[in-house]
């Protein structure tokens, strides 16, 4: 314990958090944030974008994220403190790089709740089309906003229950799906085409689909924020990141492969946003469709969205408290002791964003991925600059070659993002750069605290 305390103090912070999390706790935390059934919500978009090679898109996405996970593991060993890519960029490169990386991740924080609401609302609208999509959106946003203001939080035990239920639903779908394939339902037969189809393969198209598929992997990096609470030593966080990524990657590939075999004609989806539920109905009937829809609504629209909304509201509260945003956002509810103004602002932003992207899940996912992928580029550069540039490391494989490969892969995926996501992303980046200049001119702190 003393050794761990010393390591943290070397970074300039006092060890104040209890080190109680095991490797398994860290891994479950990563699985909860990545959501093992994440492809349920974006399957149709990825399938159409990859010309039916949806399993390949997830495989490439997993490989890309593994190299990024290796860089996370390397930096978490060097800086075992609560934080993430923005902390590593700040310490590995400089304060300005850390600010920009944090600003880019902030884009994710703002847009992720909206995506979760859109996916969940689309799922429920598919089974109750009489209720307009906007009604479902308002309902999800209202429920989560009230819960977050009152202050009810999901505990670690609740997270474990949710992950178990998700895995049960996933197992049911895979088993029923495999039986449907064996029976030749909908003309299904076993083939490797979801992994590679020479007649349809186009690297550009597949990488475009990967740029959306990687959304399902976002969340593994959240494990890094628990570095100060891990009792497994420096390597525990890095190992948990890599293992959870591999586990969820395999689950993504299996479920999308089965789905692609049941409905091989990816061009005939009535609505790509709800394609997975139609496939579930073909495989097992209406009950399986309902089961996958409810699982998506609970996992995306309640569990994940509640945490995501709470996270961004506390970031806004923290920045307002540090005088980087209007002071009103730092107001705390007198009874519930929660940042209620920030929480309501997040709800308003989510409502505006969801209204604009209501039937454009793929585009919304790409906007989110712009922030994440660009921040990951900073991460890989941080490893090289810190270890090779500052520490003069001779371990070129770990500190130069691997992060360089990761940089190239992520850059290629980033290049294949759609035009809208790049336009919105660069506008956000430009605002961040101007804001950084203003902070420097007024000699104010440029750190963005995302750990509140």
Task: Locate the predicted segments by residue.
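Helix-loop-helix connectors at the membrane interface of multi-pass transporters/channels
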Residues: 1-2, 7-10, 86-91, 96, ...
């Amino acid at each position: 314990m003393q050794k761990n305390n010393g390591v943290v103090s070397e970074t300039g912070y006092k060890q104040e958090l209890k080190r109680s999390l095991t490797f398994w706790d860290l891994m479950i935390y990563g699985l909860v944030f990545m959501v093992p059934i994440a492809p349920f919500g974006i399957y149709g978009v990825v399938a159409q974008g990859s010309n039916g090679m949806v399993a390949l898109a997830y495989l490439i996405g997993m490989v890309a994220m593994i190299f990024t996970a290796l860089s996370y593991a390397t930096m978490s060993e060097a800086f075992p403190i609560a934080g993430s890519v923005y902390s590593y960029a700040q310490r590995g490169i400089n304060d300005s790089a850390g600010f920009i990386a944090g600003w880019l991740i902030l884009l994710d924080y703002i847009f992720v709740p909206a995506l979760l609401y859109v996916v969940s609302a689309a799922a429920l609208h598919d089974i109750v089309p009489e209720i307009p999509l906007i009604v479902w959106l308002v309902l999800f946003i209202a429920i989560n906003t009230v819960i977050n203001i009152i202050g009810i939080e999901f505990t670690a035990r609740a997270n474990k229950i949710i992950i178990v239920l998700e895995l049960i639903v996933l197992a049911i779908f895979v088993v029923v799906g495999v039986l449907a394939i064996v029976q030749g339902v909908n003309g299904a037969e076993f083939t490797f085409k979801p992994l590679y189809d020479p007649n349809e393969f186009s690297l550009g198209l597949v990488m475009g689909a990967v740029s959306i598929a990687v959304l399902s992997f976002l969340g593994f990096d959240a494990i890094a924020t628990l570095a100060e609470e891990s009792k497994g030593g420096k390597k525990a966080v890095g190992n948990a990141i890599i293992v959870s990524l591999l586990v969820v990657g395999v689950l993504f590939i299996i479920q999308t492969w089965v789905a692609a075999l049941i409905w091989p004609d990816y061009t005939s989806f009535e609505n790509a946003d709800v394609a997975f539920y139609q496939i579930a109905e073909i495989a097992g009937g209406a009950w399986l469709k309902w089961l996958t829809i409810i699982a998506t609504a609970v996992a995306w629209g309640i569990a994940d969205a509640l945490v995501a909304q709470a996270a961004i509201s506390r970031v806004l509260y923290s920045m307002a408290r540090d005088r980087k945003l209007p002071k009103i956002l730092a107001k705390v509810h007198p009874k519930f002791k929660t940042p209620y103004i920030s929480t309501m602002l997040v709800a308003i932003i989510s409502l505006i964003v969801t209204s604009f992207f209501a039937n454009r899940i793929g585009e919304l996912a790409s906007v989110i991925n712009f922030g994440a992928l660009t921040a990951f580029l900073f991460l890989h550069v941080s490893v090289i600059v810190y270890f090779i540039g500052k520490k003069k490391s001779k371990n070129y494989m770990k500190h130069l070659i691997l992060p360089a490969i990761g940089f190239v892969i992520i850059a290629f995926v980033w290049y294949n993002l759609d035009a809208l996501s790049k336009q919105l992303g660069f506008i956000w980046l430009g605002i961040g750069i101007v804001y950084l200049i203003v902070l420097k001119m007024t000699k104010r702190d440029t750190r963005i605290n995302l750990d509140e």
